[in-house]
């Protein structure tokens, strides 16, 4: 287990987060993930309204982050693990990005060196039987990001 795995375990404890990831802010390298990823899904093709689009999730995510949460490739949009997300709010001051997808969403907190990502799916239950929800995901993601910022990350 890498030193970063404990942070992802914090995110996913009690099944409050569907997927937890920590990525390098500059290159998108996955530092830790609860799904064993070493990279986001890159270099695949999707069909959008009859048009083929090549997807590089890492590049698209970082480009949107640097564009205040607005995708720079509108055909691909923002995708995490081949699921399309839409920006609900990007708060540049607090460095938090809230996203929505069918039956769920994500919270991305940005630190000096990393992106802390937690996704949720309202059709999945936490350990306490309550559906995964944005409030809980936002709380754990933002809390972990604050801890990493204090540690210089």
From Swiss-Prot:
Query: Which SUPFAM superfamilies does this UniProt record tie to the protein?
Result: Profilin (actin-binding protein)
Superkingdom per UniProt = Eukaryota
Q: Where are the transmembrane segments?
A: none
According to the UniProt record, one GO cellular component term is:
cytoskeleton
> Has keyword Cytoplasm?
yes
Q: Where in the cell is it found?
A: Cytoplasm, Cytoskeleton
What are the protein's UniProt keywords?
Actin-binding, Cytoplasm, Cytoskeleton
Give any Pfam family that matches.
Answer: Profilin
Q: Give me the disulphide-bonded residues.
A: none
Cytoplasm: present as a keyword of the record?
yes
Molecular functions (GO terms) = actin monomer binding
* Entry-linked InterPro entries: PFN, PFN_euk, PFN_sf, Profilin_CS
Role this protein plays:
Binds to actin and affects the structure of the cytoskeleton. At high concentrations, profilin prevents the polymerization of actin, whereas it enhances it at low concentrations. By binding to PIP2, it inhibits the formation of IP3 and DG.
Report quaternary structure and partners. Occurs in many kinds of cells as a complex with monomeric actin in a 1:1 ratio.
Q: Return the similarity comment.
A: Belongs to the profilin family.
Q: In its UniProt entry, what is this protein called?
A: Profilin
Q: Which organism is it from?
A: Tetrahymena pyriformis
């Amino acid at each position: 287990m890498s030193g970063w795995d404990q942070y992802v375990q914090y995110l996913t404890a009690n099944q409050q987060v569907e997927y937890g990831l920590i990525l390098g802010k500059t290159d998108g390298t996955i530092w830790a993930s609860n799904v064993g990823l070493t990279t986001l899904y890159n270099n695949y093709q999707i069909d959008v309204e009859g048009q083929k689009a090549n997807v590089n999730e890492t590049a698209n995510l970082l480009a949107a982050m640097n564009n205040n949460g607005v995708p720079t490739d509108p055909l691909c949009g923002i995708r995490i693990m081949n699921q399309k997300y839409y920006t609900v709010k990007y708060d540049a001051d607090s460095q938090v990005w809230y996203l929505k997808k069918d039956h769920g969403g994500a919270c991305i907190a940005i630190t000096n060196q990393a992106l802390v990502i937690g996704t949720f799916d309202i059709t999945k239950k936490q350990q306490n039987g309550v559906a995964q929800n944005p409030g809980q995901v936002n709380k754990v993601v933002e809390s972990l990001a604050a801890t990493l910022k204090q540690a210089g990350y």
